């Protein structure tokens, strides 16, 4: 209700049927929050109708029309001309007004007991009239239905839908979608002397419409001793697919100390104001430092370090008495 000092009324469209071409028959139900006896009413009609009849008289002592018995709870059926919107599927109900006239004519004799505010007023439909602050200037929302009631064999439309929820004469519509991320991690490691040692860790998590996999493989062939340990973790966020793989292979015949740390960070953000839009941000920083030291029992030794800022670390250490050939 956009007007002050007027009894609050609600209106709903209870049924719609397609007649022909752009003509539809609609039924509306109007109800007030309080009852007003019929004796106070002089005239009640629907005006400004875009249809075969521009005025639908429901009650009028001058017109001798008495189609309703309660001005605060009544139903009316009439025809309107309605046209599909730009999508070709939706038809909006044309706007109209319901005009109330209390305490007019011979009903004025009851003025001393009148207690419901303004006595003559119009209540309008629609959601296309706003003031500078965005407040609706109509009293009832707009309604719509499917074009020519397609999909219903009996020629009737699915119950007409309101344009939205109306609160303090403002129509608002909103949709919220949420998603949940579930993560699982599996870790394994092994250490062997005078043999080939392999350790791998794989962590994967899956969220709606997204898969992330990360794997680290470390292998070494030694004549003395080999120790290999690796740990990998990965995370997944909605609507992104990311894959990362790190492989390290070392063959030694001298004394080799190899230490590597690999870290991967994935960050995915979704703009709540953009439908079906995903922004992926990948950040990785790797620094490598190789130092060769002379040793009496080997031509040289090497030290390799790799560091990245993230939530996942991989560390491999190998000590052998051979030559060094690191490959990343």
Curated annotation (Swiss-Prot):
Pfam families on file: Flo11 (PF10182)
Entries under InterPro entries matching the protein: Flo11, Keratinocyte_PR
Signal peptide: none
Record-annotated Flo11 domain positions: 1-155
Biased composition (Low complexity): 291-328
SMART domains: Flo11
UniProt-annotated stretches for the region Disordered: 168-259, 286-328
Superkingdom of source: Eukaryota
Miscellaneous comment in the UniProt entry for this protein: Open reading frame exhibits genomic organization compatible with a translational readthrough-dependent mode of expression.
Protein name (Swiss-Prot/TrEMBL): Bypass of stop codon protein 1
Protein species of origin: Saccharomyces cerevisiae (strain ATCC 204508 / S288c)
Name of the coding gene: BSC1
């Amino acid at each position: 209700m956009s007007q002050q000092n007027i009894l609050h009324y609600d209106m709903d469209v209870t049924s719609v049927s397609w007649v022909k071409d752009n003509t539809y028959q609609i039924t509306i139900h109007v109800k007030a929050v309080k009852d007003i006896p019929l004796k106070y009413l002089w005239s009640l009609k629907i005006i400004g109708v875009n249809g075969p009849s521009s005025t639908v008289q429901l009650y009028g002592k001058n017109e001798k029309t008495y189609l309703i018995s309660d001005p605060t709870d009544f139903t009316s059926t009439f025809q309107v001309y309605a046209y599909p919107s730009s999508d070709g599927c939706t038809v909006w109900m044309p706007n109209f007004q319901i005009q109330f006239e209390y305490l007019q004519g011979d009903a004025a004799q009851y003025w001393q007991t009148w207690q419901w505010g303004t006595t003559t007023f119009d209540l309008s439909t629609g959601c296309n009239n706003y003031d500078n602050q965005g407040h609706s200037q109509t009293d009832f929302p707009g309604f719509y239905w499917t074009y020519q009631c397609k999909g219903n064999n009996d020629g009737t439309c699915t119950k007409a839908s309101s344009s939205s929820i109306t609160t303090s004469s403002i129509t608002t519509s909103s949709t919220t979608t949420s998603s949940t991320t579930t993560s699982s991690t599996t870790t394994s490691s092994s250490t062997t002397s005078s043999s080939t040692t392999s350790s791998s860790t794989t962590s994967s998590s899956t969220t709606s419409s997204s898969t992330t996999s990360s794997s680290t493989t470390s292998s070494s062939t030694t004549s003395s001793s080999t120790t290999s340990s690796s740990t990998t973790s990965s995370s997944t966020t909605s609507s992104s697919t990311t894959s990362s793989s790190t492989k390290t292979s070392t063959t030694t015949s001298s004394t080799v100390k190899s230490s590597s740390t690999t870290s991967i960070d994935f960050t995915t953000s979704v703009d709540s104001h953009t439908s079906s839009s995903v922004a992926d941000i990948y950040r990785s920083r790797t620094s490598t430092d190789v130092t060769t030291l002379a040793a009496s029992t080997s031509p040289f030794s090497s030290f390799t370090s790799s560091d990245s800022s993230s939530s996942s670390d991989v560390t491999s250490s190998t000590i052998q008495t051979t030559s060094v050939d690191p490959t990343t």
